[in-house]
UniProtKB/Swiss-Prot annotation:
Tissue and organ distribution: Expressed by the venom gland.
Principal location listed in the UniProt entry: secreted
Catalytic activity: a 1,2-diacyl-sn-glycero-3-phosphocholine + H2O = a 1-acyl-sn-glycero-3-phosphocholine + a fatty acid + H(+)
Active site feature: H47, D89
UniProt keyword Ribosomal protein, yes or no: no
Entry EC number(s): 3.1.1.4
Keywords: Calcium, Disulfide bond, Hydrolase, Lipid degradation, Lipid metabolism, Metal-binding, Secreted, Toxin
Protein name: Basic phospholipase A2 VRV-PL-V
Entries under PANTHER family matching the protein: PHOSPHOLIPASE A2 FAMILY MEMBER, PHOSPHOLIPASE A2, MEMBRANE ASSOCIATED
Amino acid sequence: SLLEFGMMILEETGKLAVPFYSSYGCYCGWGGKGTPKDATDRCCFVHDCCYGNLPDCTPKPDRYKYKRVNGAIVCEQGTSCENRICECDKAAAICFTKNLNTYSKIYMLYPDFLCKGELKC
């Protein structure tokens, strides 16, 4: 769920999901269109695509369990949907960490109208 994803983001990056990732660029937050603004925004685009590959699941409200083993995120065994949602969230949290050096505050609270066009997953 968004709760676990938010905790993963905080643990990985040291940043709160809200406000740092909740409306960043064109893809972080609800919906998404246009070209990702930077590597962090691309993480969100890929995350959206990952969720899009789970048509039988409801990623935002579905809870799952994960733990950390030697600093690494490990998704715990759950239902098929829980496992796949956790893996999508884990990949995004790791992606955010890898791209912390290019995170730019100019893309926080980025206006949707500046995001034009459609990208295919």
